[in-house]
């Protein structure tokens, strides 16, 4: 069975994921509430649009770290599994609990306890989780997002496509530095797939606007007057 430490880390990782980075930075730097302007989202894209590119990067890095750090603690610290369980628990249940803690910051970001259980789309946070599992896939996902974003100008489309690409790579690449056994691998596939479904659902309004041709488009080339 789980120890008291499991519940401690459960609350800690959820609270960390829930921390509204964009909301705090917007209010501290420019006294703007990202929930009320632009796309009304507290993520890095809306922060870039409203606060400027520099602050958008800052929001991305903080949200990225919210996913990266807890996942590293769960997957890379050899004694972590023993810490959160009492002896006698089946290894498969241990793997399920570990994988749940790994993705918890993603759902914390989407359903923030500090924002009436509302939140962002968790792209940066999920990339942080993926990078902890497999740094190569995480960095490749970021590169793919950046290139597609520059090419098409739609952050939402680039986010969805990069998320799907990362999922496919995780599935087809069998070895991941952050995963210690096959059972944990399979369980993580399930949880990552579940979080991807929520990410796409969070983008439902963007998908509708893309279909209608009304989605906000970034322009990286300034027009000459």
UniProtKB/Swiss-Prot annotation:
This is Glycerol-3-phosphate acyltransferase. The lineage of its organism: Bacteria, Bacillati, Mycoplasmatota, Mollicutes, Acholeplasmatales. One of its GO terms (cellular component) is plasma membrane. The gene is plsY. The keyword Cell membrane applies. Catalyzes the transfer of an acyl group from acyl-phosphate (acyl-PO(4)) to glycerol-3-phosphate (G3P) to form lysophosphatidic acid (LPA). This enzyme utilizes acyl-phosphate as fatty acyl donor, but not acyl-CoA or acyl-ACP. Keywords: Cell membrane, Lipid biosynthesis, Lipid metabolism, Membrane, Phospholipid biosynthesis, Phospholipid metabolism, Transferase, Transmembrane, Transmembrane helix. The keyword Transmembrane applies. InterPro entries: G3P_acylTferase_PlsY (IPR003811). It is an enzyme of class 2 (transferase). The chain crosses the membrane at residues 6-26, 55-75, 95-115, 135-155, 160-180, 187-207.
